């Protein structure tokens, strides 16, 4: 019993003699003063101080902000010629995507009916016939687009490349715009 009391008292004195943990590590005193760093200042001499890429860039307008709205893929290019359109559709078919034609009289997203997105805000277009499963040539798609244009002359018409395995739309571009 005496030995256990001696042991307890020796532990207590050891605990009191141990220094506080805060004094083992130096406390954070903040950042060094600014006077320790050398100061170099450039004098403003005009445009020569601005960053430059050697003057190779010329200013160009991206698109006119009035009267020419942009759509999806390829909308920043000029209107596709028939040859370019055929090449794009051949690319779509070559990748195994199913061509599908859609049309809309509105053509743009507008929130006239409600503040939240929905069916009637122009986001969803009407499908022209069924998706062209088994389509092997771009000429078939162009023929269907011309038929849709004949039926709805005031409509926007787009071609969609649909991947029926992953069930996603892979490409979409406008083929006809109203005049």
Swiss-Prot record:
Top-level division of the source organism's lineage: Eukaryota
UniProt xrefs under SUPFAM superfamilies: RuBisCO, small subunit
Transit peptide: 1-58
UniProt cross-references to InterPro entries, sorted A to Z: RuBisCO_ssu, RuBisCO_ssu_dom, RuBisCO_ssu_N, RuBisCO_ssu_sf
CDD domains assigned to the protein according to its UniProt record, in alphabetical order: RuBisCO_small (cd03527)
BP-aspect Gene Ontology terms: photorespiration; reductive pentose-phosphate cycle
MF GO annotations: ribulose-bisphosphate carboxylase activity
Primary subcellular site in the record, as a coarse category: plastid
Keywords from the named record: Calvin cycle, Carbon dioxide fixation, Chloroplast, Photorespiration, Photosynthesis, Plastid, Transit peptide
Pfam families given in the database record: RbcS (PF12338), RuBisCO_small (PF00101)
Keyword Kinase annotated: no
Localization in the cell: Plastid, Chloroplast
Matching Gene3D superfamilies: Ribulose bisphosphate carboxylase, small subunit
Any single GO CC term annotated in Swiss-Prot or TrEMBL for this entry: chloroplast
Functional summary from the UniProt entry: RuBisCO catalyzes two reactions: the carboxylation of D-ribulose 1,5-bisphosphate, the primary event in carbon dioxide fixation, as well as the oxidative fragmentation of the pentose substrate. Both reactions occur simultaneously and in competition at the same active site. Although the small subunit is not catalytic it is essential for maximal activity.
Family: Belongs to the RuBisCO small chain family.
Miscellaneous comment in the UniProt entry for this protein: The basic functional RuBisCO is composed of a large chain homodimer in a 'head-to-tail' conformation. In form I RuBisCO this homodimer is arranged in a barrel-like tetramer with the small subunits forming a tetrameric 'cap' on each end of the 'barrel'.
Subunit structure: Heterohexadecamer of 8 large and 8 small subunits.
Official protein name in the record: Ribulose bisphosphate carboxylase small subunit, chloroplastic 5
Source organism (scientific name): Fritillaria agrestis (Stinkbells)
Gene that encodes it: RBCS5
């Amino acid at each position: 019993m005496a030995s256990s009391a001696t042991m307890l008292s020796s532990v207590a004195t050891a605990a009191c003699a141990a220094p506080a943990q805060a004094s083992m590590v130096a406390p954070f005193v903040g950042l060094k003063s600014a006077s320790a760093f050398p100061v170099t200042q450039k004098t403003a001499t005009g445009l020569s101080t601005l960053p430059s890429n050697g003057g190779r860039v010329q200013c160009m307008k991206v698109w006119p902000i009035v009267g020419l709205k942009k759509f999806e893929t390829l909308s920043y290019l000029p209107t596709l010629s028939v040859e370019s359109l055929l090449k794009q559709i051949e690319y779509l078919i070559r990748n195994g995507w199913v061509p599908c034609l859609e049309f809309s009289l509105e053509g743009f997203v507008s929130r006239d009916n409600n503040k939240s997105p929905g069916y009637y805000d122009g986001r969803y277009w009407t499908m022209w016939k069924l998706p062209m499963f088994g389509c092997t040539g771009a000429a078939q798609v162009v023929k269907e687009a011309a038929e849709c244009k004949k039926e709805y002359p005031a409509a926007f018409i787009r071609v969609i490349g649909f991947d029926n395995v992953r069930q996603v739309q892979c490409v979409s571009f406008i083929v006809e715009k109203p005049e």
